[in-house]
């Protein structure tokens, strides 16, 4: 067999091959649009030249503190400039950024710090109580840097002598950072919600982050210089990679410390916000704003919404208010959104019920994803594309995680058969669009955050008066879903709903506490298995 001429003497070399990374997006934006506003935070403004310089200073300062390739830098930050800077400054050293969910409780944060072997922690003073409590519990003893927000001062305790702005000032503005030697190198670490025990550490690589950044711009319709409002927490899947996406098109980041109606309307009106993302809580907050909180919106604002699909009434109200909606679906393991409900123009000719049905579907694969399907998890065969046969939603491609940190067994299980197993059950239609039907792990998605029903049930079961309990999702216009607990009490014992809720508040992060407690017989099969599908129907009327 003669050699393939296209393989002869045509080799990869530095001239024709460089590892993909989102880091060079910022370098280019600073070169081409040095004076364009990159970040707005209160009265603070940073141009792209300043943004790039601050990231280089951060990288330099971290290097001076001993941070290098393969080290983990953890952050407990709100959607503020340091969070954006960490997305570039940390990986500029070959280090890995670990963003911590500020809504977690201290034991989970301590576990993450230990599991990640965190070498340095940047913490906002708003979250000082959480960080301090976690550090007491953790074996890891990272160096600490405090962020004192000059725009929204916080009264939390300062945990170290190192102030973030002083750290930035100490860095070299001309620091020569390095491209990753391999695009497969880790760039960030995100933890799952820990639905079956301790959370798993999801590792992203430079290649996936770069491709996801491009894909976001395509799917969100972002042209040059969009204005993006940070209603989505950047600790969640690295803000779906939008911290990097905006540098591709030299967009403006509008930081939002708290998701509040007045601040959102002011940002949209004053800064000309063109795009924002988030869970249904963002939409309900906008819609439920008082007249005093509202501002007229005279331009198109595109909203990417994910998590549990909001009620049709919310979608209709958002559209009537002038927002353009796009439904997305994904997981921590897929860098955030991996499917998009691409709207076809012919659907506009459907009646209201038909259009509503189309909106409930999770959609087709993201442009950066190589394959999306629904398989029978036992046979690994594709289910019929009939919109009725249920299987497991599975993904394949470059925006699937590298794997789970220090968990070879879980990684192998997740990738069994050459597909990433989502754990979500759904159907696929003849046009290739998928729709979720259930979550095999009974995850409750509230305000964009995953809540394990098992974790909540475990806490309730520990109450001495509880005989049986089950926790399911109850639809909620504001949060998307909230936990609803069904409880059977032990004979001759009593407990009120308020008592059980107080019990939960002492043992769970606040957002995980059920909003409703229903005292009723918990339906079970003949073998004793709780029938959660029945409870979900009951919860709708609870």
Enumerate the predicted regions with their spans.
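Structural core segment of the AMP-binding/adenylate-forming
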Residues: 64-65, 92-169, 491-493
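Conserved AMP-binding/adenylate-forming core of the ANL superfamily
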Residues: 17-18, 23-27, 35-80, 84-88, ...
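Conserved AMP-binding/adenylate-forming
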Residues: 269, 301-303, 310-328, 332-434, ...
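Conserved structural elements of the adenylate-forming
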Residues: 52-60, 169-174, 188, 202-223, ...
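AMP-binding/adenylate-forming catalytic core of the ANL superfamily
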Residues: 104, 111, 121-125, 276, ...
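Conserved AMP-binding/adenylation subdomain of ANL enzymes
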Residues: 210-227, 235-275, 289-290
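Conserved pre-ATP/AMP-binding loop-to-beta segment of ANL
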Residues: 34, 145-146, 157-165, 169-191, ...
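Adenylate-forming
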Residues: 78, 123-132, 232, 259-263, ...
